[in-house]
Amino acid sequence: LSRRQRQMCIRDSPRIIDHPEAIETITYRELRELAYMGATVLHEDAIFPVRQEGIPINIRNTNAPEDNGTWIVGSTCQKSKYVITGIAGKKGFCSVNIEKDMMNSEIGFGRKVLQAFEENGISFEHVPSGIDTMTVFVHQDEFMHKEQKVVAGIHRLANPDMIDIESDLALIAVVGRGMKSTRGTAGRIFSALAHKNINVKMIDQGSSELNIIIGVA
């Protein structure tokens, strides 16, 4: 970790963004979302006991203890001046794209597809779907040497019309408790990606609106 990272949590990777802004306050949920996508500040095992007891954590730099650092809390009413708390990303994913006419009316279709992954010991990351389509995002290194078995399992269990696989994808997590109360955040995110000619493959936003996961090629 750089000195800046040891001092406090930052909003972006210093390997990508010059002089990233510091995070003054972050919730445990926000930190977990960012850590899951590769942000390395504190290991989950290190914060689990104090999180369970609702004890806040203050990260400071031992070389500059007078600085405020970053507070990690269970919840906060403090309104951040930033809509987005942090951004993290991870490479090495692939998507298994499945199509079948009238898929939406077939009871248990999603379960059958995921069963093929379970039988081969592969966990999934995200499962966006449409009326006749379903996509399963998985770690590429876990999937590629079991690809034929998984595809055969999907055909056997779900009988799809088509299966297509895309590799070398990345997932970006945009995390922030302020996104829920701010209109147009997603639009600005996608405008920034389009401005850099980045092809968006998947969008996944939970009902909590705490984060937006974007799959890119």
Tell what function each PLM region has.
Residues 3, 57-59, 125, 201:
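Short hydrophobic alpha-helical runs that function as membrane-insertion/retention elements
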Residues 7, 14-65:
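Polyanion-binding loop/helix "lid" in catalytic or ligand-binding cores
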Residues 1-10:
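Single conserved hydrophobic/aromatic residue that forms the stacking wall/gate
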Residues 11-13, 203:
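Non-heme iron-sulfur electron-transfer modules
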Residues 68-217:
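A conserved regulatory-domain signal marking ACT and ACT-like small-molecule sensing domains
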